């Protein structure tokens, strides 16, 4: 069975969702220590920035309540770096987050 190690408590990266219906590109900054996820969506130019503040339970952009705990993200064991496309957080294809390349230390 696939296992996942958690990512470092603080990271940032680029998100690419390739889809004919709703493609997406975003920059994400994640801090488990501050319990915040900062997301800027793009379509050529920045469209919107949201901030999920799990410390206060508030989501900013359109202010709304935020419930639950901050999500953790994982990297599968024995993942070479860089390694091409991999799904993180799921044991089966298409059940997690697709990552095209992972750079960094485990």
From Swiss-Prot:
Biological function: Lectin with affinity for N-acetyl-galactosamine, carragenan and glycoprotein porcine stomach mucin (PSM). Has metal-independent hemagglutinating activity towards erythrocytes from rabbit and human. Hemagglutinating activity is not inhibited by D-galactose, D-glucose, D-mannose, D-fucose, methyl-alpha-D-galactopyranoside, methyl-alpha-D-glucopyranoside, N-acetyl-glucosamine, N-acetyl-mannosamine, D-fructose, alpha-D-lactose, beta-D-lactose, D-lactulose, D-sucrose, fucoidan or glycoproteins thyroglobulin and ovalmucoid.
Reported pH dependence: Optimum pH is 6-7 for hemagglutinating activity. Activity drops rapidly at lower or higher pH.
Source organism per UniProt: Haliclona caerulea
A GO molecular-function annotation: carbohydrate binding
Record note on modification: Glycosylated.
Subunit structure: Probable heterotrimer consisting of an alpha chain and two beta chains. The alpha chain can probably have different glycosylation states.
Temperature dependence: Thermostable. Retains hemagglutinating activity after incubation at 60 degrees Celsius for 1 hour. At higher temperatures activity drops drastically.
Entry keyword annotation includes Thylakoid: no
Keywords: Glycoprotein, Lectin
Glycosylation: residue positions: 65
Species lineage: Eukaryota, Metazoa, Porifera, Demospongiae, Heteroscleromorpha
Keyword hit for Ribonucleoprotein: no
Protein name: Halilectin 3, beta chain
